[in-house]
Amino acid sequence: MQEYYLNSEKKICLMELSEFKELEGAYPHKRNLFRSMNPVQYCKAESYGDCLFGTMKIPRALKGRVTYIVFGFYLRGEELLLIEDGSFLKTCLGRLEKIIPTECSMHQFLVMIFEMLIEDDVIYLQQQEEKLASIEEELLKKIPEHFYEIILQYRKRFSAYHAYYEQLVNLADAMQSDFGQILTDKERSLWQLYANRVERLHDHVELLREYLVQIRELYQSLIDVQQNKVMSILTV
C-alpha cells in the first residue's frame, strides 16, 4: 500500500484488492465494494451517507482487441482509497502530484482522476474516424478481402466505448444528485463540466457507429452490383 497526502488532513491510499480486503478500520459498506470488484462489471458510483464508492472499467483498444483497465475507489471524509491490482493508477497519481492545486478537495481530486482517464479520447476517436475514411476510400477502389472481420472489430470497439461513456454520464449525474448537498459550487461545476465532456465523446462514438453502418451498406451495394454483372454475363 502506498500513501499520498494532499495536506496533513487529506490522504490518498493506493492498494491492491487483497490489501483492501484485509483493511481494518471504520469503512462502511466496504464489503459491497469488494463484491463489486470480483470482477468489475462496469463504471458506477454509489453513496451512503458520507461514504462514496464505485468501480471503473475503462476500455483500451490494443492491436485490434479491446482490453480493460479496472479499479475501485472509496471516499469517506478526507480519505480516498484507490484499489487496483495493476500499475495504471500509480502512473496517474505520479502525474497528478505535479499539477494538484494548493487548495484541492477530495472531490476535486477524484474529478481530476476521471478527467485524466478521458484526456486523450478525442484524439483517439478522431484517429478512428480517419481510419474509417481510409476504409471507405479503399472500398471504392477495390472490394477488400475479410471485410466483415475488419468491420466486426470496429463494431466491438465502438460498442465498448459507447457503453463506457454512457456509464460515465450516469456516474457524473449520480455524483451531482446524490452528493449535491455537500458539494461546493466549484465541485458541482467540475462534475458538470466532466459530464458535458463525456456526453460529447458519447455523441462522437454515435457518429462513428453510424459511419460504420454506412460503410457496410456501401460494401453490400458494391457486392450486389458485382453479382448482378456476373449474372448478366451468365445469362448471355
Where are these regions (language model features)?
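Long, well-ordered alpha-helical segments
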Residues: 123-137, 167-177
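Well-ordered alpha/beta subsegment
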Residues: 108-132
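A generic short alpha-helical patch detector that favors 3-5-residue windows
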Residues: 84, 101-102, 124-127, 186, ...
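A ubiquitous short alpha-helical element
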Residues: 79, 116-123, 156-159
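Short, charged/polar, low-complexity loop and linker segments
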Residues: 101-110, 137-148, 183
